[in-house]
């Protein structure tokens, strides 16, 4: 079994998890490739090689392990891209909607992971591009959670003109607009009043950020919809975020968002269930009146 391992943070929890993986009783059947930034960890093992970027990975790999929180998991897709390589997240962070494998149950979980006893679920991505190529050519313009436009260098509202499949729909006077995948519906969009959507739904959510007009509500659309956005306001520029990546874009620039032509494979163990995760993470059903 050929496995790539990544973490964007170096701390004791990450080092402990990494060490546990490399010395696990099933590790002798695996070839491990750890990301270059993990070489600074104190590892008492030598059964691994290093990788630096997505060009070092290929279809011969069986699994990509992300050690950290959901932010680390989002970074992982930049390495995996369109390889159809399952990603499993071992959670050393906080909430963990994507990194669902708990470090407290690590030994049992690793036995299943290293024996390939996991299920795989497809998650859709969003692709973004702009006129005038505002996004660097060497970047990865895809989002597993959301793409958003927000104001920059001003406390004034911006106007986000939005068209769907070539039809003008609305101009959101607001702090910005979130375009979210079903996976991202439990993230930034949810904090701004958006709905929770099952991650395998064929949907996209448009969620305005603090809209001036209270009738500007979140909108759920088909993921086959082509979205066009342009921003105007008192300042000359606004911010475009693609998951954790942020770019400065000139106002009036047309931004296009659509579903990606490839999916991300999310691996889970222990009979993962999205609705159980909702209950655990959002404390649904915990009210004493229930």
Give the label of every model feature segment:
Residues 1-63, 67, 104-119, 129-141:
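ATP/NTP phosphate-donor binding region
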Residues 14-15, 72-76, 186-191:
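Short glycine/serine/threonine-rich phosphate/pyrophosphate-binding segments
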Residues 31, 84-86:
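Proline-centered loop/turn at the N-terminus of a beta-strand
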Residues 149, 154, 165-168, 216-290:
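ATP/nucleoside-binding phosphotransfer catalytic cores, i.e., glycine-rich phosphate-binding loops
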